[in-house]
Design a protein with these regions (language model features):
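N-terminal targeting signals for export/organelle localization
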Residues: 1-44, 156-161, 165, 171
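A short beta-strand-turn-helix
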Residues: 40-61
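Short pre-active-site segment immediately N-terminal to redox-active cysteine/selenocysteine motifs
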Residues: 59-61, 66-69, 132
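Hydrophobic beta-strand anchors of alpha/beta hydrolase catalytic cores
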Residues: 62-63, 91, 136
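Conserved redox-active cysteine motifs that mediate thiol-disulfide chemistry
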Residues: 65-82
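Solvent-exposed loop/turn segments at secondary-structure junctions
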Residues: 67-72, 97-101, 123-124, 152-153
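Conserved segment of the thioredoxin-like fold in thiol-based oxidoreductases
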Residues: 85, 90-121
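Thiol/disulfide oxidoreductase modules built on the thioredoxin-like
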Residues: 109-113, 120-167
């Protein structure tokens, strides 16, 4: 009986998070876009089924530009997983400089990512986001970039604070 009680107490204090789940390569149908925007940078969805014109994306949305090979990008994934778990703001990833699309898919599955990912096949996003990663942009409902985070987002608290401040989304 004593063991059961101790085990129950122990299990109560173990944090259960989505970080251990398997990711899913999802389609881009959930990305809010202004369909009247017909010109701009067209990026394929990592699932290979659709393309999205970057300039047509509308928010509130957090755009995270990353590469699976990038150590700081890997460090910030848990913070995006925490944000996604709140279901309050959209996240869209842009995978850059991968050897191929399958490498990006493998990364998504391994890291537990479940938000739409666009795939930059030829470094076309460098002209928009710059050459380094990670880069995170916060885009409002009108499609305006209201904040740019260059470099790693170091904590979930910082990410949530930026969403609150720049996208006016209460978390």
């Amino acid at each position: 009986m004593k063991r059961i009680l101790l085990l129950s107490l122990f299990l109560t204090f173990i944090p259960f998070t989505s970080h251990a789940t398997t990711g899913l390569v999802v389609g881009c149908f959930g990305i809010k876009v202004d369909k009247t925007v017909s010109k701009g940078l067209s990026l394929p969805c990592l699932d290979g089924k659709a393309k999205v014109i970057y300039q047509g994306i509308r928010g509130p949305v957090v755009i995270n530009v990353f590469g699976s090979w990038c150590a700081p990008c890997n460090q910030e994934i848990p913070h995006f997983l925490d944000l996604q778990a709140l279901h309050k703001v959209s996240i869209v990833g842009i995978d850059v400089e991968e050897t191929n699309m399958q490498a990006g898919r493998n990364f998504v599955i391994k890291k537990g990512i479940t938000w739409p990912i666009l795939y930059d096949t030829n470094n076309a996003t460098r002209g928009i986001f710059g050459p380094g990663v990670p880069v995170t942009w916060f885009i409002n409902a009108q499609g305006k970039v209201v904040y740019k985070q260059i470099g790693v987002i170091a904590s979930t608290l910082k990410l949530k604070s930026e969403v609150n401040k720049y996208l006016k989304v209460k978390l």
